[in-house]
C-alpha cells in the first residue's frame, strides 16, 4: 500500500491492524535515539503529537506504523 494520510479513527484502526495483539503506543521506538543523534527531539512534548505529525499532517506507510507497535 502507498503512504497515505491517516487521521483520527483511521489512524487508530490502522495501528490496530498493523500491531495486532502487541498493541501500540504513540512514540516510535527509534525516535529518541535518532533525535538524540541529531541533537534535538521532535517529540519533546511527547506522545500523540509525534504520530499525528508523522501520519496525519504528512503521510506514512504500514511499515512506518510498525514503529509505533509495542
UniProtKB/Swiss-Prot annotation:
Disulfide bonds join 7-56, 19-69, 55-60. Coiled coil: none annotated. Pfam families: Insulin. One of its GO terms (molecular function) is hormone activity. GO terms for biological process: glucose metabolic process. InterPro entries: Insulin, Insulin-like, Insulin-like_sf, Insulin_CS, Insulin_family. Residues 33-49 form a propeptide. SUPFAM superfamilies: Insulin-like (SSF56994). It is found in: Secreted. Signal peptide: none annotated. GO terms for cellular component: extracellular space. Keywords: Carbohydrate metabolism, Disulfide bond, Glucose metabolism, Hormone, Secreted. The keyword Ubl conjugation does not apply. Belongs to the insulin family. Insulin decreases blood glucose concentration. It increases cell permeability to monosaccharides, amino acids and fatty acids. It accelerates glycolysis, the pentose phosphate cycle, and glycogen synthesis in liver. Heterodimer of a B chain and an A chain linked by two disulfide bonds. This is Insulin.
Amino acid at each position: 500500500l502507498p503512504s497515505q494520510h491517516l487521521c483520527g479513527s483511521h489512524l487508530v484502526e490502522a495501528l490496530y491492524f498493523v500491531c495486532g495483539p502487541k498493541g501500540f503506543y504513540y512514540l516510535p521506538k527509534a525516535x529518541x535515539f535518532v533525535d538524540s543523534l541529531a541533537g534535538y527531539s521532535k517529540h519533546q512534548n511527547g506522545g500523540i503529537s509525534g504520530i499525528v505529525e508523522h501520519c496525519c499532517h504528512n503521510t506514512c506507510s504500514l511499515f512506518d506504523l510498525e514503529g509505533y507497535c509495542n
